[in-house]
């Protein structure tokens, strides 16, 4: 297993419980989408898998290691094997895009190479290749504060693609993108995960994107798993129940009606990592 959570819970110092009794596992190369209303615990779940949150109860294993039972040095080594795409990528505003992407390997390269790359980028071609996959190659030498929110998100994805981690986690990676770029970006994440047989876990606001690109859907509600099902078994009724606390229908990226979301899930995945023309 690439990761396993057994009855894992997370409680904060103020007593608020973010996750409750989460049992979840993924095998090598398995893509999983996590959906649910705001405050359901999606980000907390990803942070738990990234080993940036420690469980208050239960057991966590990531890449065949127990993060909280190893030394600080081994924990740092484990974290270098995990790639995290943030909704708002943590990049210094004045940092160049090329440097931001190469930072994906700072924990892997020798210290001297990491330090030198901050001044003289060590692999300009490699960074450019990842940007080109996301149609952003022309911004390689721009500063991060010159980019839009969606462009910054693509830089964050490019950094993880360049890192080549053994576990890819993505927290709302396309929330600032239009439907065309969102599909392009998720397609590249899927392609990377499929090609290298590494697990990909992404939290997504848009239900239609989750069903389009991921064969397994985990629904979170109030910090608990509401369902864990193949995409083709996620029905409109399940989605309405999951989002019952929100005033609107389950959120979608485009104009697709809720009644057509689950019906098209099986055809959208089927091993093909190209989006259907209707969404482009």
Swiss-Prot record:
What region holds the ABC transporter domain?
3-247
GO-annotated cellular components? plasma membrane
State the UniProt keywords alphabetically: ATP-binding, Cell inner membrane, Cell membrane, Membrane, Nucleotide-binding, Phosphonate transport, Translocase, Transport
Catalytic activity, EC: 7.3.2.2
Name where it's found: Cell inner membrane
Superkingdom of origin: Bacteria
Q: Which Gene3D superfamilies match?
A: P-loop containing nucleotide triphosphate hydrolases
What residues does ATP bind to?
A: 36-43
Which reaction does this enzyme catalyse, per its entry?
A: phosphonate(out) + ATP + H2O = phosphonate(in) + ADP + phosphate + H(+)
Q: What class of enzyme is it?
A: translocase
Q: Which residues form the signal peptide?
A: none
The way it spans or sits in the membrane comes to: Peripheral membrane protein
Any single GO molecular-function term of the entry would be: ATP binding
What does the sequence similarity comment in the record state about its family?
Answer: Belongs to the ABC transporter superfamily. Phosphonates importer (TC 3.A.1.9.1) family.
Oligomer status and interactors: The complex is composed of two ATP-binding proteins (PhnC), two transmembrane proteins (PhnE) and a solute-binding protein (PhnD).
Query: What biological function has been recorded for the protein in this entry?
Result: Part of the ABC transporter complex PhnCDE involved in phosphonates import. Responsible for energy coupling to the transport system.
The name on file for this protein is: Phosphonates import ATP-binding protein PhnC 1
Give the organism the record lists: Cupriavidus necator (strain ATCC 17699 / DSM 428 / KCTC 22496 / NCIMB 10442 / H16 / Stanier 337)
Read off the lineage from the record: Bacteria, Pseudomonadati, Pseudomonadota, Betaproteobacteria, Burkholderiales
Its gene is phnC1
